[in-house]
């Protein structure tokens, strides 16, 4: 095991090359307890990087204005560590930036659908904090089912977006991800992405789909199941915001307390089996079919609909 193990330098120098050398030589690198400062760890295909839980901190150096602490290749895994943008105390960013935690990146566009992109990778059991961009960022990863990641059992805090999915990025799966105290809990601008048992609570905005300018022909058409969207922007913000989604999206078996739903110029958006608390507002503007089914409220919600004759509200009840 010793040959796979790497200790921290203890002097704050860039450990990126040392980590990459272990990964290239053995396919595995195990980081011990302590702080590992990096400019970017570029993981070779098929490699695995793991730590000792929150005792291991991979820290993106302050000198890096744009980039990621860890860049995934194909068939990579990152497990059991704290990945952070600084060793200093930080607040939630005011704007979305370019410093990311763990990034899976290709170069897909609307026009190169056949080009091979990076393949399946995994993220598990990580605490990710203090990045101006995404804690987990998926950038132009393409349209193939195996050009995707599976992420589970992570906590993401004080980032521009807990999860940041760019356009032309599909088939990613997230389970038991707690995105809290971020500017956005999740920005999901790709398609066919799945979220289950995740928390998008106590962010400025909980969950955003934004295709309002038609930037991507392949947007939305995914699902969110069993997730929470509570206490957005100090109980006055938007829990779910869907803008310009053209191909449908399903939110099912979710909880929404002290947060709003906003849907604009979108089609085939389904909200079903929601438990709602106080201060909820639902706003729909333009677009086509938007369906709200089996909603339970603690008090009568405020519902506003304009320029849309296809909004359904089925089985609304007060407890």
Stretch-by-stretch model annotation:
Residues 17-23, 36-45, 49, 70-71, ...:
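Short, T/G/N/S-enriched strand-turn elements that build extracellular solenoid repeat scaffolds
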Residues 35, 142, 169, 213:
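Active-site-proximal loop/turn and secondary-structure-junction residues that shape catalytic pockets
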Residues 3-30, 37:
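Acidic Gly/Asp/Thr-rich repetitive segments characteristic of extracellular carbohydrate-active
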Residues 52-55, 74-85, 115-130, 145-160, ...:
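Right-handed parallel beta-helix
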Residues 20, 24, 36-50, 58-118, ...:
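Extracellular beta-strand-rich solenoid/capping regions of secreted or surface-exposed proteins
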Residues 1-7, 315-319:
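Glycine-rich, low-complexity segments
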